[in-house]
Amino acid sequence: AYNVWMSGDTSAEAVHALARQVRGDGIRTLALKVGDHWQISMNLIDPLRIGPDIAFDRIAQLVPFMQADIDHCELVGLLSEAALKKISSERWDKLGLGIETTIEYRRSHGYNF
C-alpha cells in the first residue's frame, strides 16, 4: 500500500472526494481516518507503470481545489528497485521512499520473505 496522509484540518468530504477522483487506472483507493488524521490509502496495481510518484501527483493536482493539504507519505511494504528507479531520486524523501524501501535492498541485507 501507499498512503498519503492529509493535514489535520482536511475534511472527511475532501478526503473522500480525493479518493474517488484518484481511483482508477492502476490505483485502488480508500479514505481512512486514523486518529485525528485522514489518509488516502492506495493499492498500486502495477507500480512499474503507475508508481507512488504518479499516485502522489494525482492527489497533489487536486488538493488546491479541495481545501486540503498533504502532510506526508508512506510506503507500506516494499517496492521493486526497478519501480523506484523510474522516480527521480530528488523526489524520494517527499514521497517517503528510498533505496532501503526496495525488495532487493532488504534481500541483500539478510531479510527473508
Segments and roles (model prediction):
Residues 1-113:
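Long, contiguous binding/interaction regions
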